Each structure stands twice: as structure tokens, then as C-alpha cells.
Amino acid sequence: MTKKKAHKPGSATIALNKRARHEYFIEEEFEAGLALQGWEVKSLRAGKANISDSYVLLRDGEAYLFGANFTPMAVASTHVVCDPTRTRKLLLNQRELDSLYGRVNREGYTVVALSLYWKNAWCKVKIGVAKGKKQHDKRSDLKEREWQLDKARIMKNAGR
């Protein structure tokens, strides 16, 4: 029996979309693969990705990541045209695609990218079916977060 490889030090997360959790209620999450070009993989290994403005388009029975920015490396090949904001195809199975189509078309949800990470040697994107928050929802979340920080600070100082 072979030994399992030791986990590499460092985080597997490439990019997070913190704004999505602030602006949307995330109802359901899916893991999807990405169809990438060689220079994009090289950029991701260097951690040069931004998904803060990205969302998922559902068209012709397929899902596409739109608005993600992968900054090309300076040492990437010169004979390939590098488009940092190109639309990338998401690799999902048919059941997941049908679920996304149903939620988006019927119930008025949207699909946003939540995080970009490595799973073994493959780059994966976590997408979420989301519904927009109102302004008062955002304010109540902010108050709750501040209260949690204050509570932790009080408990820390109470032990002294």
C-alpha cells in the first residue's frame, strides 16, 4: 500500500470574494472546475487572480465565469494573446446545471463566484446561488459582526 503524499504547506485558497457574502444571501453552494489555458494556470499558481466582480452566466446549457481577472505573468509566452478578463467555461454535471437553471430562471436568484482554490492539482471555483440583500440586511449584519468582536474583546480582557 502506498503512502499518502504530505500536504504542501500554505493555503490552497487562491482568491476569495468577500463582497459576495456582504451583498447576497448565499442559499446553496456548488464546486465547479474551470477550463483554463496554460498561462492562466501559471498566473493562478502565482496567486494573481481577482474574482470580486465575477458572476456566472448560464447560456446554451453551459455555465461560464464572467468578470474574473487573471493577471498574466510577465514571463508568460509571447505568441499567445493573454486576455485577463476572458469568459471561462465552468465544468459542472448536468444535474447541477439543471438545478442552477431552475433557481435562476424561476425564482430570481443569481449565481456568483465565492472562492477560487486548488483541489489536488485542479483549480476549482466555489459558486453560490444567491439572492440580493437589502440595505437594512447589510446594516444588521455589520452590527452583528461588530457585536461579536466587542464580545470577544470583553471576554479577553475579563480573564486578566
Curated annotation (Swiss-Prot):
Gene3D superfamilies the record matches: 2.40.280.10
GO MF term (any one): RNA binding
The protein's name: SsrA-binding protein
Predominant localisation class: cytoplasm
Native organism: Citrobacter koseri (strain ATCC BAA-895 / CDC 4225-83 / SGSC4696)
Gene Ontology cellular component annotations, sorted alphabetically: cytosol
GO BP terms in the entry: trans-translation
PROSITE patterns: SSRP
Record HAMAP family: SmpB
Function: Required for rescue of stalled ribosomes mediated by trans-translation. Binds to transfer-messenger RNA (tmRNA), required for stable association of tmRNA with ribosomes. tmRNA and SmpB together mimic tRNA shape, replacing the anticodon stem-loop with SmpB. tmRNA is encoded by the ssrA gene; the 2 termini fold to resemble tRNA(Ala) and it encodes a 'tag peptide', a short internal open reading frame. During trans-translation Ala-aminoacylated tmRNA acts like a tRNA, entering the A-site of stalled ribosomes, displacing the stalled mRNA.
Cellular location(s): Cytoplasm
Similarity remark: Belongs to the SmpB family.
Alphabetic keyword roster: Cytoplasm, RNA-binding
Superkingdom of source: Bacteria
